[in-house]
Amino acid sequence: MTHLRKTHPLMKIINSSFIDLPTPSNISSWWNFGSLLGVCLVVQILTGLFLAMHYTSDTMTAFSSVTHICRDVNYGWLIRYLHANGASMFFICLFLHVGRGLYYGSYMFLETWNIGVLLLFAVMATAFMGYVLPWGQMSFWGATVITNLLSAIPYIGSDLVEWIWGGFSVDKATLTRFFAFHFILPFIIAALAGVHLLFLHETGSNNPSGLSSDADKIPFHPYYTIKDILGVLLLILALTSLVLFSPDLLGDPDNYTPANPLNTPPHIKPEWYFLFAYAILRSIPNKLGGVLALILSILVLAVIPFLHTSKQRSMMFRPFSQCLFWILVADLLTLTWIGGQPVEHPFIIIGQLASILYFLLILVLMPITSLFENNLLKW
């Protein structure tokens, strides 16, 4: 008798996605991050749901409602810090997942990659709006600075900003709509992640060698389910360690001060996972130019498949491209550091050079190096 999982309409979908899915036999731990991102999303939705039960999206009570969650709600402090640090874990997994895609040429699956870029934008938008909700100093001023960037759009800019604010400044209307969007976006992200998987399963997974693995496939369960569970356990260990030992390590002390429109903090900066983009934004003295550079710093990922000039898919056997890849990683770490520094002498020029190098590596140096490597192999 055929298994129920192969005949039942719902079980059939689960079976073909997570049980009998033919998977390359040689995918490494770098392929674990997809499932880890799924776990992160579930954790964020669940903790967010419980936080929303106690949070009030009103400028007068938002800050005190977060304080109430931490002090009076049963395990409220745990839920709040799991949610805040869960976002950091989410972005760590995201960056590693994208890095894996770049290194092993997974971007050649065009639909999967483009939906991934869309997901990255959606997660960044969600995280930004979530950072505004506690209504601390950095929440308020971060919202003011980032939404104000839209005023750089010619002709409609200032109207657009006031439309987003729901008034003439960041106020009650802004907070309420940010809460509404912050609540709904994770469900849109979950739906997009489903489409992401749908397109991935059309082609099957890539593997470290970048070669076709059609001749050597194994079922996803039990091999990769066990492997994914190990990854999940390590993620939970890292997250709980962070939450229970140093929950404020990645936060900003300014956000423990209630929002005050009359007092600007000395250094306005976003959460650590946006610092690289923030550094690119600040490296251009012109407002519109900075906004375009900020958007392009993420959108450039969508161009990468069209700049693939190598005859090989993966970087596994391309040492020169590997060198450039790790220079790109170092450059992003440099940008992250610069984004958290004040705008003064050594940091300005370092940020500008790192920003130029970022675009130069992706758009020019990597494609040229790939062509050079083709010639080395007489292809």
Curated annotation (Swiss-Prot):
One of its GO terms (biological process) is mitochondrial electron transport, ubiquinol to cytochrome c. A ubiquinone binds at H201. Heme b b566 binds at H97, H196. Its main location: mitochondrion. It is found in: Mitochondrion inner membrane. The chain crosses the membrane at residues 33-53, 77-98, 113-133, 178-198, 226-246, 288-308, 320-340, 347-367. GO terms for cellular component: mitochondrial inner membrane; respiratory chain complex III. Keywords: Electron transport, Heme, Iron, Membrane, Metal-binding, Mitochondrion, Mitochondrion inner membrane, Respiratory chain, Transmembrane, Transmembrane helix, Transport, Ubiquinone. It is a multi-pass membrane protein. Its cofactor is heme b. GO terms for molecular function: metal ion binding; ubiquinol-cytochrome-c reductase activity. Gene3D superfamilies: Cytochrome Bc1 Complex, Chain C. It comes from the Eukaryota. Pfam families: Cytochrom_B_C, Cytochrome_B. Component of the ubiquinol-cytochrome c reductase complex (complex III or cytochrome b-c1 complex) that is part of the mitochondrial respiratory chain. The b-c1 complex mediates electron transfer from ubiquinol to cytochrome c. Contributes to the generation of a proton gradient across the mitochondrial membrane that is then used for ATP synthesis. The cytochrome bc1 complex contains 11 subunits: 3 respiratory subunits (MT-CYB, CYC1 and UQCRFS1), 2 core proteins (UQCRC1 and UQCRC2) and 6 low-molecular weight proteins (UQCRH/QCR6, UQCRB/QCR7, UQCRQ/QCR8, UQCR10/QCR9, UQCR11/QCR10 and a cleavage product of UQCRFS1). This cytochrome bc1 complex then forms a dimer. Belongs to the cytochrome b family. This is Cytochrome b. It comes from Sorex tenellus. The lineage of its organism: Eukaryota, Metazoa, Chordata, Craniata, Vertebrata. The gene is MT-CYB.
